[in-house]
């Protein structure tokens, strides 16, 4: 996808995602997270080295204390995966997950049994609702 295509999808889908998920789960405590697509992965973002790589090249991550959802476009091949990443991270924003809650959840659950992840994945199922196609 081109940067223009990505921006068009975000501009269309993100407000709809916010509205639907907010109506079902309420508002988050902070401002609505902005979307940042300027890094190719989490290693490049945190190291400051644009070409840095590692074993966990995810499609997205949210850093709520910074009020930002980071989308790693090289790992997002199409509209479906882009919308799923937006839904997933916006759901986490509304869950009010603190660093302590994250540590406890990571100790008590695997990724697949973590209640925060289960809820985010369940919300992803409605991705077609936010597609322009």
Regions found by a protein language model. Give the residues of each.
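N-terminal low-structure segments adjacent to metalloprotease catalytic domains
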Residues: 1-4, 70
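Zn2+-dependent metallopeptidase catalytic core
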Residues: 5-30
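Short alpha-helical functional segments enriched in proximate histidine and acidic residues
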Residues: 20, 93, 123, 127
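Propeptide-to-catalytic entry region of secreted or membrane-anchored zinc metalloproteases
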Residues: 31-42
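Active-site scaffold of zinc-dependent metalloenzymes
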Residues: 46-80, 97
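Post-HEXXH active-site segment of zinc metalloproteases
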Residues: 80-84, 95-124
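Histidine-centered divalent metal-coordination motifs
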Residues: 88, 92
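Long, well-structured alpha-helical subdomains associated
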Residues: 128-133
């Amino acid at each position: 996808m081109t940067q223009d295509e990505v921006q068009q999808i975000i501009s269309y889908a993100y407000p709809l995602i916010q509205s639907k998920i907010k109506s079902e789960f309420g508002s988050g405590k902070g401002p609505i997270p902005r979307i940042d697509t300027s890094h190719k992965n989490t290693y490049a973002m945190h190291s400051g080295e644009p070409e840095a790589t590692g074993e966990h090249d995810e499609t997205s991550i949210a850093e709520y204390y910074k009020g930002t959802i980071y989308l790693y476009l090289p790992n997002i091949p199409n509209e479906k995966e882009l919308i799923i990443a937006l839904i997933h991270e916006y759901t986490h924003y509304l869950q009010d997950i603190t660093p302590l809650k994250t540590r406890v959840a990571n100790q008590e659950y695997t990724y697949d049994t973590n209640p925060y992840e289960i809820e985010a994945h369940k919300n992803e199922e409605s991705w077609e609702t936010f597609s322009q196609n």
